[in-house]
């Protein structure tokens, strides 16, 4: 959520920066009118309350002097009714303003490239060389099916499309990856491990920005108004909702493993086969709470921590700086890390690393004090995938496949695979 005071005082600047996102600014236009009405109502209400206070004093004086106070009492009642009417109008306007503020996306940082869509994203760096196979690379779903380590067909029978059974060495590979990632981030990158709930309430989804705008993308438990987590970012960020931290508490670094659930409402016909776009998938998530002045340095460090996973797995990748039109609702700046997928001869997203500045903290009420009695300030929050595990499995199956259909186990994973070097 943006700072309402900043929006009011810098309306044209905010409007211009949001135009770079390609956003519909209808809600922003409504803000100006409603905010003006709100301030007028507050002024009128304060004036009437002062009038009521004077009437109260007058009534007391009249009663002390044994004079007729009925006209003054009647006047005070009428003023009270006017105040009640204005208070109701004010409440209605403030509710509308809150919904508008919740629907306005974050402001892009000045370093974010201006552009319309993914075609305007800028490559920041590239690592590793794509494998040069002497045979035609198979897509990962064929590699996995031939090895009988992933079952897409039976998952479709049991649940439906975009679900999967891992089995045998496929399940072992998935488990090896999340243990490897959790160990790396906890032991080498200094994160505290978390295993969060997979179900969250509406306030949590609102705090991180999934609601109200993207409710159709979420899996909802209708009877309880609960939601399946789309990412561990939601429960872990809300771990400190409505809290005031001390300066010594920052930075806070949490790494969480969880299943993630997405409806993929806007993805009909895209990636209908394989592990790239599933309704349920496992992910390791990195969440940071930092002082505002540190957040952009932390974004670079966070992105490097996610990259380290791919480097140790020896998977070629590139880092893309997202343009304003492909930034997402909550991020002020975002990097996507994309891994090489040989069968598609392209890079595909495997991690997003974002700085939200105080956008989530303002929605979730997460603040800190620099001094014991100091004025609370909003923290800056950041998160990144470290990594999406299903997509990492896909990348390993494709980049490490051999002509005979077997798959080499990346060296760094072998201790997690009982020393196994080959799948097949």
Swiss-Prot record:
Compartment list: Cytoplasm
Cystine crosslinks: none
Residues the entry annotates as binding L-serine: 231-233, 285, 385
Keyword Transmembrane attributed: no
Chief place of localization: cytoplasm
GO molecular function terms noted in the UniProt entry: ATP binding; catalytic activity, acting on a protein; serine-tRNA ligase activity; transferase activity
EC number, as in UniProt: 6.1.1.11
Catalytic reaction equation(s): tRNA(Ser) + L-serine + ATP = L-seryl-tRNA(Ser) + AMP + diphosphate + H(+); tRNA(Sec) + L-serine + ATP = L-seryl-tRNA(Sec) + AMP + diphosphate + H(+)
Pfam families, per the entry: Seryl_tRNA_N, tRNA-synt_2b
GO cellular component, one term: cytoplasm
Residues that bind ATP: 262-264, 349-352
InterPro entries according to UniProt: aa-tRNA-synt_IIb (IPR002314), aa-tRNA-synth_II (IPR006195), aa-tRNA-synth_II/BPL/LPL (IPR045864), Ser-tRNA-ligase_type_1 (IPR002317), Ser-tRNA-synth_1_N (IPR015866), SerRS_1_N_sf (IPR042103), SerRS_core (IPR033729), tRNA-bd_arm (IPR010978)
Gene Ontology biological-process annotations: selenocysteine biosynthetic process; seryl-tRNA aminoacylation
Pathway stated in the Swiss-Prot or TrEMBL entry: Aminoacyl-tRNA biosynthesis; selenocysteinyl-tRNA(Sec) biosynthesis; L-seryl-tRNA(Sec) from L-serine and tRNA(Sec): step 1/1
Keywords: Aminoacyl-tRNA synthetase, ATP-binding, Cytoplasm, Ligase, Nucleotide-binding, Protein biosynthesis
NCBIfam families: serS (TIGR00414)
Function according to Swiss-Prot or TrEMBL: Catalyzes the attachment of serine to tRNA(Ser). Is also able to aminoacylate tRNA(Sec) with serine, to form the misacylated tRNA L-seryl-tRNA(Sec), which will be further converted into selenocysteinyl-tRNA(Sec).
Domain comment in the entry: Consists of two distinct domains, a catalytic core and a N-terminal extension that is involved in tRNA binding.
The protein's assembly and partners: Homodimer. The tRNA molecule binds across the dimer.
Family: Belongs to the class-II aminoacyl-tRNA synthetase family. Type-1 seryl-tRNA synthetase subfamily.
Record's protein name: Serine--tRNA ligase
Organism: Oceanobacillus iheyensis (strain DSM 14371 / CIP 107618 / JCM 11309 / KCTC 3954 / HTE831)
Lineage, highest ranks first: Bacteria, Bacillati, Bacillota, Bacilli, Bacillales
Name of the coding gene: serS
């Amino acid at each position: 959520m943006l700072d309402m005071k900043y929006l009011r005082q810098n309306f044209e600047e905010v409007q211009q920066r949001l135009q770079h996102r390609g956003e519909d600014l209808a809600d922003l236009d409504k803000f100006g009118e409603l905010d003006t009405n709100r301030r007028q109502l507050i002024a009128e209400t304060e004036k009437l309350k002062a009038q009521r206070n004077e009437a109260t004093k007058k009534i007391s004086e009249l009663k002390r002097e044994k004079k007729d106070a009925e006209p003054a009492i009647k006047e005070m009642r009428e003023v009270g009714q006017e105040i009640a009417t204005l208070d109701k109008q004010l409440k209605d306007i403030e509710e509308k303003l809150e919904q508008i503020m919740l629907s306005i996306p974050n402001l892009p940082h000045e370093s974010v490239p201006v552009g319309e869509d993914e075609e305007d994203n800028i490559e920041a760096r590239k690592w590793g060389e794509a494998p040069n196979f002497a045979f035609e690379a198979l897509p990962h779903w064929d590699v996995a099916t031939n090895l009988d380590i992933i079952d897409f067909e039976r998952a479709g029978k049991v649940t439906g499309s975009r679900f999967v059974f891992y089995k045998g060495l496929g399940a072992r590979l998935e488990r090896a990856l999340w243990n490897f990632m959790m160990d790396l981030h906890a032991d080498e990158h200094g994160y505290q491990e978390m295993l969060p709930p997979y179900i969250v309430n509406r306030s949590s989804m609102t705090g991180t920005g999934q609601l109200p705008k993207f409710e159709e993308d979420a899996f909802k438990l209708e009877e309880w108004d609960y939601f399946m987590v789309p990412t561990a970012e939601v429960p872990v960020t809300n771990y400190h909702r409505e809290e005031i931290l001390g300066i010594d508490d920052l930075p806070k670094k949490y790494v969480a493993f969880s299943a993630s659930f997405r409806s993929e409402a806007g993805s009909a016909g895209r990636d209908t086969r394989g592990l790239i776009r599933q309704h349920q998938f496992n992910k390791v998530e990195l969440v940071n709470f930092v002082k505002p002045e540190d957040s952009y340095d932390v974004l670079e460090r966070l992105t490097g921590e996610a990259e380290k996973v791919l480097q140790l797995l020896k998977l070629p990748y590139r880092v893309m700086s997202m343009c304003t039109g492909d930034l997402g609702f909550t991020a002020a700046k975002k990097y996507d890390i994309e891994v090489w997928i040989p069968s598609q001869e392209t890079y595909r997203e495997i991690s997003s690393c974002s700085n939200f500045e105080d956008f989530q903290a303002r929605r979730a009420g997460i603040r800190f004090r620099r001094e014991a009695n100091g004025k609370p300030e909003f923290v800056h929050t950041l998160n990144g995938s470290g990594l999406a595990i299903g997509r990492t499995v896909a990348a390993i199956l494709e980049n490490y496949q051999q002509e005979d259909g077997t798959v080499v186990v990346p060296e760094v994973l072998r201790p997690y695979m009982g020393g196994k070097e080959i799948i097949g």
